[in-house]
Amino acid sequence: MADTTGRIPLWIVGTVTGILVIGLIGVFFYGSYSGLGSSL
């Protein structure tokens, strides 16, 4: 964990990307079920 000089660890990139993708899909489905999907 100490050799992260100037480079983001791959597991952090994967975790953040996964959270963003899951959050985006969740917001999309929530908006479509709430009737707000057309405004997104």
Swiss-Prot record:
Keywords: Chloroplast, Membrane, Photosynthesis, Photosystem II, Plastid, Reaction center, Thylakoid, Transmembrane, Transmembrane helix. InterPro entries: PSII_PsbJ, PSII_PsbJ_sf. It is found in: Plastid, Chloroplast thylakoid membrane. SUPFAM superfamilies: Photosystem II reaction center protein J, PsbJ. One of its GO terms (biological process) is photosynthesis. It comes from the Eukaryota. The chain crosses the membrane at residues 8-28. GO terms for cellular component: chloroplast thylakoid membrane; photosystem II reaction center. Gene3D superfamilies: 6.10.250.2070. It is a single-pass membrane protein. Pfam families: PsbJ (PF01788). PSII is composed of 1 copy each of membrane proteins PsbA, PsbB, PsbC, PsbD, PsbE, PsbF, PsbH, PsbI, PsbJ, PsbK, PsbL, PsbM, PsbT, PsbX, PsbY, PsbZ, Psb30/Ycf12, at least 3 peripheral proteins of the oxygen-evolving complex and a large number of cofactors. It forms dimeric complexes. One of the components of the core complex of photosystem II (PSII). PSII is a light-driven water:plastoquinone oxidoreductase that uses light energy to abstract electrons from H(2)O, generating O(2) and a proton gradient subsequently used for ATP formation. It consists of a core antenna complex that captures photons, and an electron transfer chain that converts photonic excitation into a charge separation. Belongs to the PsbJ family. This is Photosystem II reaction center protein J. It comes from Coffea arabica (Arabian coffee). The lineage of its organism: Eukaryota, Viridiplantae, Streptophyta, Embryophyta, Tracheophyta. The gene is psbJ.
